[in-house]
A protein has these predicted regions:
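Short hydrophobic/small-residue motifs within alpha-helical transmembrane segments
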Residues: 60-64, 151-152
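Interfacial helix-cap and linker-helix signal at transmembrane-aqueous boundaries
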Residues: 43-44, 75-77, 160-168
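Intracellular juxtamembrane helix-capping segments at the cytosolic ends
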Residues: 121-135
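Cytosolic juxtamembrane N-terminal segment immediately preceding the first transmembrane helix
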Residues: 2-24
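Glycine-rich segments within core transmembrane alpha-helices of 12-TM secondary carriers
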Residues: 138-159
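Extracytoplasmic
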Residues: 16-51, 68-72, 157-158
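Conserved MFS/SLC helix-loop-helix module at the cytosolic interface between two early adjacent transmembrane helices
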Residues: 67-105
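Hydrophobic core of transmembrane alpha-helices in multi-pass small-molecule transporters
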Residues: 26, 106-122
Length: 168
């Protein structure tokens, strides 16, 4: 794909939908392993749990969130995307707040479950489903462009978090 072809595709595609996809894949990072792993050591230290215990809690919460995603994810087919996206953002906000307040193993499980469901699951799902619903002919281009959001987050978010943690 040439630079000209890449940028010219925006003339035929809805830039708003691609930006929506980019933003949602970017912020899905809050529920992605690379992001949550940044807090692994401090959580284990705070709760006095081992790597294995943390891993078991993480795996169980992730598995449960994937099963729940099947049920919640299909709601996007019957709901206005703006409304669905609003609910997902609210859930991610609540999840992030709860994640910042982890004080027990049970709370850790709930927080990871909600972060994985809302961030990694529903944010990604909303982005991909919206792009797939809106685009027919250039679906692949639109999806690949919107998924640059996650790649960008994988670079930006760890640097940002490590920088912000220096102030604590």
């Amino acid at each position: 794909i040439t630079t000209h072809n890449f940028f010219s595709m925006f003339k035929s595609l809805s830039l708003k939908v691609i930006i929506f996809g980019f933003i949602f894949t970017f912020f899905s990072s809050f529920g992605q392993s690379f992001f949550l792993g940044l807090f692994n050591s401090s959580i284990r230290e705070t709760l006095s749990i081992s790597h294995g215990q943390f891993g078991s809690i993480y795996a169980s919460a992730t598995l449960l969130s994937s099963f729940i995603l099947i049920w919640i994810g299909k709601k996007i087919d019957d709901m206005n995307i703006s409304k669905f996206a609003f609910y997902v953002v609210v859930l991610l906000s609540i999840s992030s707040f709860l994640f910042s307040k982890i004080s027990s193993i049970v709370f850790l499980f709930i927080a990871i479950f909600l972060m994985r469901l809302s961030g990694q699951g529903l944010m990604s799902h909303a982005a991909s489903t919206t792009i797939s619903r809106y685009f027919e002919k250039s679906r692949g281009k639109a999806l690949s462009t919107s998924w640059l959001g996650l790649s960008s987050a994988e670079f930006v978010m760890p640097l940002t978090i490590v920088f912000l943690l220096t102030f604590i």
